[in-house]
């Protein structure tokens, strides 16, 4: 995984600090959906979710500012998503 701290911040934000039902019941850390059905993927273990993030999202990344790249590809619908990722990163930096 490239930019693991940012990816961790994404997982934290997407799952509400790993408390969401999607995380707990389906082991989906990133809100990944099947583009054909629009349904959330279900994984047997959280590590499968990380692998899926790499193969379905990060494989497109060719370098540069990762946060800007996430914004450019429209990773999240929330227009404040990148600001929220930065907020989580700052929080993690204080830990």
Predicted regions mapped to residue ranges:
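Catalytic cores of secreted/periplasmic lytic hydrolases that degrade extracellular macromolecules
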Residues: 1-95
């Amino acid at each position: 995984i490239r930019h693991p701290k940012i990816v961790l911040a994404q997982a934290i934000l997407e799952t509400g600090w790993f408390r969401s039902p999607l995380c707990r019941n389906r082991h989906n850390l990133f809100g990944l959906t099947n583009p054909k059905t629009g349904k959330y993927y279900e994984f047997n273990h959280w590590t499968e979710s990380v692998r899926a993030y790499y193969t379905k999202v990060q494989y497109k990344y060719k370098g540069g500012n990762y946060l800007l790249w996430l914004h450019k590809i429209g990773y999240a619908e929330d227009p404040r998503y990148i600001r929220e990722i930065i907020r989580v990163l700052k929080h993690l930096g204080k830990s």
